[in-house]
Amino acid sequence: PAHLSDEEAATLPCAAVTAWHALVGEGTLKAGDTVLVQGTGGVSIFALQFARLQGARVIATSSRDEKLARAVQLGASDGINYNTTPKWDERARELSGGAGVDYVVEVGGAGTLAQSMRAVKTGGQISLIGVLTGGAGQVNPLPILMRNIRVQGIFVGSREMFEAMNRAIALHHMKPVVDRVFPFGEAVEAFRYMDSGAHFGKVAIRR
């Protein structure tokens, strides 16, 4: 999209198209749906933005209240601090009228999947796009069967999805959230910053 800087455009081929794939490519997201996004990293923030473009409601989770405040400024209707609210799945159901959310953008993996299954509504969808808590763990698959939950693995996206996403970004003049831009000589510092979890959105390196 012509309105983006080089750094902003560089965030699109991986994080952005992954979020688009989750909600649009493999989903049927529509206005009025409720989406739960875990955390405030690159994919989750893009998912928040794309969901809002579609007229959906977004609930965000984070371990930091200041990040939740920024998510609300970006369009989330509610934020849940999972440190102070460990049963964030119950809170998500409360915020969605007791039925559960329509979509979960799942970044935690084995450590959070069971709670995501409790947070999502019967017939809802969980898009697994990351395993930040690790891949090993015990998850009871029975709720997936009995409540008709769709769990979909998402890994980046196709060229067709990428082109459709870019048309939507251009039409709405959407701007990716780039937290910090590091010069190439400070690449190590950039990775350390990202590893610290302090970032909100994307971290870019400019050569």
Feature annotation, model-predicted:
Residues 18, 43, 111:
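Hydrophobic/small residue at the entry helix of a nucleotide-binding pocket
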Residues 54, 71-72, 107-177, 181, ...:
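Glycine-rich phosphate-binding loop and adjacent beta-alpha segment
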Residues 1-38, 73:
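NAD(P)H dinucleotide-binding glycine-rich loop of Rossmann-like/cofactor-binding domains
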